[in-house]
Amino acid sequence: MRTIRLLAAAALIFLPAASFGTERFDGNWLTKLTCPPKGNTEGYTWQFPSIIQNSIFHGERGAAGQPGYLSIDGPIAGDGSAKLTANGIVASREYARGVFAHQGESYSYDIKAQFQETTGTGTKGQGLGIVGRTCTFEFTKQSPASPPNAK
């Protein structure tokens, strides 16, 4: 019986710390995606808001279902490592590489990312339709909004 009480006490002490550690990335983030020009394909940089909640990343750019849309999702491990998945719709052949890269076509790729407390970086894997250039990601945690002055 004494062993059970000790285990219960230890669980109460250590569980809050464990959950805090896995949610340390939670908050609003700014995501910057940069794909350099290569060959006849133009480069581009997109910035869009993202959120991490319960150590799950979610970011969206554009209108769902429309050319230029991009959604990024995935879990973040306690050490900050993440394998995120991007799904999008080609905006213009001018900015996309590959045989199937035509306006309105869907694409997807994986992102290998590493998060710190307030910053993160990532690189795009080779995805169908947009192969052949390295795209990079920068993640910056945003400060929480200041509460309004109470009067």
What are the roles of these predicted feature ranges?
Residues A10-I13:
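Short, linear, compositionally biased motifs with a strong N-terminal bias
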Residues E23-F115, T121-A150:
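Central antiparallel beta-sheet cores of small beta-barrel/beta-sandwich binding domains
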Residues P16-A17:
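N-terminal signal peptide c-region/cleavage motif recognized by signal peptidases
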Residues M1-A8:
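Bacterial N-terminal signal peptides that target proteins for export
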